[in-house]
Amino acid sequence: MDVNPTLLFLKVPAQNAISTTFPYTGDPPYSHGTGTGYTMDTVNRTHQYSEKGKWTTNTETGAPQLNPIDGPLPEDNEPSGYAQTDCVLEAMAFLEESHPGIFENSCLETMEIVQQTRVDKLTQGRQTYDWTLNRNQPAATALANTIEVFRSNGLTANESGRLIDSLKDVMESMDKEEMEITTHFQRKRRVRDNMTKKMVTQRTIGKKKQRLNKRSYLIRALTLNTMTKDAERGKLKRRAIATPGMQIRGFVYFVETLARSICEKLEQSGLPVGGNEKKAKLANVVRKMMTNSQDTELSFTITGDNTKWNENQNPRMFLAMITYITRNQPEWFRNVLSIAPIMFSNKMARLGKGYMFESKSMKLRTQIPAEMLASIDLKYFNESTRKKIERIRPLLIDGTASLSPGMMMGMFNMLSTVLGVSILNLGQKRYTKTTYWWDGLQSSDDFALIVNAPNHEGIQAGVDRFYRTCKLVGINMSKKKSYINRTGTFEFTSFFYRYGFVANFSMELPSFGVSGINESADMSIGVTVIKNNMINNDLGPATAQMALQLFIKDYRYTYRCHRGDTQIQTRRSFELKKLWEQTRSKAGLLVSDGGPNLYNIRNLHIPEVCLKWELMDEDYQGRLCNPLNPFVSHKEIESVNNAVVMPAHGPAKSMEYDAVATTHSWIPKRNRSILNTSQRGILEDEQMYQKCCNLFEKFFPSSSYRRPVGISSMVEAMVSRARIDARIDFESGRIKKEEFAEIMKICSTIEELRRQK
């Protein structure tokens, strides 16, 4: 079905067409090779912004550290990180004055959460720097390794399962003179393959014990591993992002919990809400400014952009903020919250894999690991890399760079939003004490500023004052990249406002199409995406109908399941034709079995199996949904599954879709090649972990699962649960006396084994 694109724009107001200018179709750019160069850029830039600060040396690690706090006031428009402590504290005080009790209440909420959070909270999240192996791992594995090492070093608070107790272990681990860890290493040897008689490299994995002295351990505990941010659209250059290790994560989580609680109470904060809720919040602020700017007042809005937000923020400022916010709280709570910023003030950035060199003439390739950058002769490098390495050298220790100023990307989004909002809050007339006043929206580093004043000079004065106030707390509004407009037209976090929010539909484009999970899930996700966009993003009925037809076409090509009566020849067409001919009710065949498409924009909410169930031949129903059919997935199917969809910006979103278990909901098997690599040990750990969790869930069906109170291990919990259940089953006659006795005996044996261990 071909569409002439100009027809789409005949009746579209220009501002609605903005989304077509976004770089969101096609594949996003990915990075290849190492992120070492990007990381060095980040470290060097961060130090450059704070270069007039004071240098000190960390007594424990020997790392040189730069402290720009209370540094010189800026004299030009260059970005700088010289935040003034007293200004930040004053901004906090005014924020509290305009929102009485906000900090107090948020602290109380956070304290409750701190006491209830289980350590398994840290298994959420993707790649995490695993300090025991000195590389990235899935979060759950990294946590398991950390706890295992702590345990073998005599730290056992974490076994109670509360996150706060685990953090006590982290604190104690930093005082230890040495830590013993188990690391994996690879042995490679050349052997002759019996079958092919060729020489092949065989890899074996060994585990070895290694002792880290206090200094080496501290460096690892304070290390953030760095990677290149992938799939960033609309940028020419890539940039580095950081993943912290398990020691830092728990502390950051609690700080962000507190900051999130504060953000929820601030009308100018674009976090932590999203989607329609966020739009409503923003529209409120705009409405307030529009109604208050009577006929006599002008109102202008700046679509703001800050220069290098993260690199000019400073953990020492965050420490000052936390100290102020928690000032009337118990000592233990203040201590727990102040550790994250302190660790960040002493952080080390791991430089990644290093550089790859190749000699074209000799056909040689060699990797220069980051550890060697401190001592290698610079003549091998090109001009720009040489400059980078020269600048970073004084900061290097064991392949990591000391990075005291700056916050790596995405670490304290909520807390930095609180700082931004505190400056927006100073725009009230009672604080500006003049004819201009401002308000706005802040979401991490993105902001929109609305300034009202009786005339243009007043607007200019207001913007200048805002700009200078920001400078005092280390926020640098970019004069080049921010632009000002009459209020009513602006952009904030990729939402476009034009007398109301315009749907920026292009952002959703990447999530249209076939996901590639399996035939059943893909069909369901595809129609759900279209349905959601009709609800949330102004996807009109005609366009939705077209999107649906394109999706079905795409789906049929992906799975080679063209209609049974089609002329198209594929590998599956022979079988599908046969099925088509022997089916009485052809409308009942699923699209993936060569059936017709019965979806239209009215029935997108119904799973395809349900939509066609009444139309199916009986034997087809039996094959499709028979639990004894070996191709039907046997795990208990929830009625709702979660798919990961990729919107154009921001992290992958989780989207719910209806799941019906059929022969089409297969799960692909894991690639075998992983079994021959260094990851094999990790895979076994992961499977072990999985088995334990599955077993635990068998004992505690979700209905009876309460947050564990008191301190007991998973095994103890399961044993006591087994005893209770057995007794109830025995007394109600569901099990015989012999079975009851056998269960009790097994429980005792398990307890005995635990005691011996």
Swiss-Prot record:
Record's subcellular location: Host nucleus; Host cytoplasm
GO BP terms: DNA-templated transcription; symbiont-mediated suppression of host gene expression; symbiont-mediated suppression of host mRNA transcription via inhibition of RNA polymerase II activity; viral RNA genome replication; viral transcription
Region annotation Disordered: where it falls in the sequence: 50-82
Enzyme class: transferase
InterPro entries for the chain: RNA-dir_pol_NSvirus, RNA_pol_PB1_influenza
Biased composition (Polar residues): 55-64
Superkingdom in the source lineage: Viruses
Record's catalysed reaction(s): RNA(n) + a ribonucleoside 5'-triphosphate = RNA(n+1) + diphosphate
This protein's GO CC annotations: host cell cytoplasm; host cell nucleus
PTM (free text): Phosphorylated by host PRKCA.
Keywords: Eukaryotic host gene expression shutoff by virus, Eukaryotic host transcription shutoff by virus, Host cytoplasm, Host gene expression shutoff by virus, Host nucleus, Host-virus interaction, Inhibition of host RNA polymerase II by virus, Nucleotide-binding, Nucleotidyltransferase, Phosphoprotein, RNA-directed RNA polymerase, Transferase, Viral RNA replication, Viral transcription
Primary localisation category: host cell
Subunit description: Influenza RNA polymerase is composed of three subunits: PB1, PB2 and PA. Interacts (via N-terminus) with PA (via C-terminus). Interacts (via C-terminus) with PB2 (via N-terminus); this interaction is essential for transcription initiation.
Job of this protein: RNA-dependent RNA polymerase which is responsible for replication and transcription of virus RNA segments. The transcription of viral mRNAs occurs by a unique mechanism called cap-snatching. 5' methylated caps of cellular mRNAs are cleaved after 10-13 nucleotides by PA. In turn, these short capped RNAs are used as primers by PB1 for transcription of viral mRNAs. During virus replication, PB1 initiates RNA synthesis and copy vRNA into complementary RNA (cRNA) which in turn serves as a template for the production of more vRNAs.
The name this protein goes by in its record: RNA-directed RNA polymerase catalytic subunit
Organism of this sequence: Influenza A virus (strain A/Duck/England/1/1956 H11N6)
Top-level taxonomy: Viruses, Riboviria, Orthornavirae, Negarnaviricota, Polyploviricotina
